[in-house]
Amino acid sequence: MSDRPVLEPDSAPVVSEAVGPPHEPGTVLRARYRLTHVVGRGGMGNVYRAEDLRLPGRLCAIKEVTPEPHLSPELRRQANQQFLQEASILAQLDHPNLPKVSDFFSDDSRDYLVMDFVPGHDLRELLQASHARGEKLDERMVLDWAIQIIDALSYLHRQSPPVVHRDIKPGNIKLTPDGRIKLVDFGLVKLLAQDDARTITVVQGRGTALYTPLEQYGGDSGHTDARTDIYALGATFYHLLTDFPPPDAKTRFLNPRALRPPRGLNTNISPHVAEAILWAMEMHPDDRPQSVAEFADVLFGHHARAHPARPATLASALRENRTAALLALGLFLLAVVLTLL
């Protein structure tokens, strides 16, 4: 195996067939927001940079959410209600490391979330620039970022009901020109107190493969919680500090040795930092830190990891994770079919 990392994008979600062509530059939404250009394109819609015509000089980021075209009118109505409920919660959030949500609305079967435009570069771009120079990101710098990211996640998870981001990755973390970290892209945020999993699936999407734990596969939203974010956070720090993208959870499920020890890829990583990363990336949620505060204690060297993980066996994983069992069966059958062709 080569010791050079294979540079990959954040493995962005597959763009849904519902996502049509973006609005033309100059389009005005809600008689207030003039779109300048597309700054991102995700699984459920586009993200635009816009000028606020009511407050000259203010720039906004507008997240577009488009429901699947085959949905019944009733499911479309539920999807819109879910969006409005989530957006109203997000608009109440106020934290220095989160962009402020200032408005939300629906127009022509699409929902829009308006938030502050965050200038600067995302951590994926900084990682790629460091790689191009033949360098690795400095651990002290990454831990400085970690302080701010963890503070934002702690704030989200303390809400009532708790708010889980569900798509933490280097590309969704921005560093502003004044050195502040912003956790962006609320497109996959999920509130834990929901009754209709179908609506959640319609609105949310499914995260990003390299940073997504096994319980999040298949849109099984009822089994995700704060520990889902902790896995993604650990995977993000793994990538930032090793310069190697982590193997996705499906690969790790079939091959537990696929995840290489962080210090084997970068000897400058402190032992306690490597320990925290591997703890956060445990396959079973019960084996991970149960809060970001627990994760932070080990990451910053305040405490050692309390308990070792249970022995990881395929049989135990199958018994405890129905989604994983179905996934493993599907992969096995696919391998058999390909062998026979």
Language-model-derived ranges and their functions:
Residues L210-A306:
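C-terminal lobe helix-coil module of Hanks-type protein kinase domains
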Residues N46:
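Conserved N-lobe ATP-binding subsite of Hanks-type protein kinase domains
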Residues I150-V163:
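Protein kinase catalytic-loop region centered on the HRD/HxD motif
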Residues E51-C60:
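Conserved N-lobe loop of protein kinases adjacent to the ATP-binding glycine-rich P-loop
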Residues F104:
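Activation-segment/catalytic-loop signature of the eukaryotic protein kinase fold
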Residues T66-Q92:
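AlphaC helix of the eukaryotic protein kinase fold
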Residues D108-D122, L126:
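Conserved short submotifs of the Hanks-type protein kinase catalytic core
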Residues W145-A146:
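Activation segment signature within eukaryotic-like protein kinase domains
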